[in-house]
Amino acid sequence: SYLDGLRQAVDLRADGTSLLVLFLGSTLGNFEPDRAVEFLSDIRQIMLPGDVFYVSTDLQKETSRVIAAYDDSIGATAAFNLNLLARINRELGADFVLSQFAHEARYDSRAHRIEMHLRSRANQTVAIGKDFKCELREGETIWTESSYKFRCEDISRLARRTGFVCEVQWVDQEWPFAQSLLRAV
């Protein structure tokens, strides 16, 4: 796991050196808020005071921009989402018919999160392996992923709550995205 790899890096570092840990992309947004706190707290427990955690986060923006990014015109996100069913078919012996599902991106403005769903185009029964069957009604969805969007002050607050201080943030204003340098205290 990521934390196991971090523990190994800490064990290998030379005495007296600081550690720089990268968590790029916007993966932190894929954690439920309580899990994000737990994850950063776990990282902080592994790091020493003065070590640096560099994290990327997608920032809050207009709903239309978020939806456009996750329901893109070339269908890349839809293909990625449908690939989850293809993998379940391949790896778990399921019989999802991919053409019977449509990709949907929904933005929950209260939670500041985008949700990926696969909507059933028909009433259907799907077998997963030999022992499990799932009944889906037309219009029913499978919620496959969430991605929370942050404000810069959310990251600073999260840092303080988990034993870090946010020293600096770099923000791309064109497509609001932040790189934050958090120092373990």
Please tell me what each predicted stretch does.
Residues 1-15:
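S-adenosyl-L-methionine
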Residues 16-26:
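Short SAM/SAH-binding signature in class I
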Residues 30-43:
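A short, conserved alpha-helix within the catalytic core of class I
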Residues 45-62:
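Conserved beta-strand signature within the Rossmann-like core of class I S-adenosyl-L-methionine
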Residues 59, 65-164:
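Substrate-binding/catalytic lobe of Class I Rossmann-like enzymes that use SAM or dcSAM, i.e.
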Residues 165-169:
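A short linear hydrophobic-aromatic micro-motif
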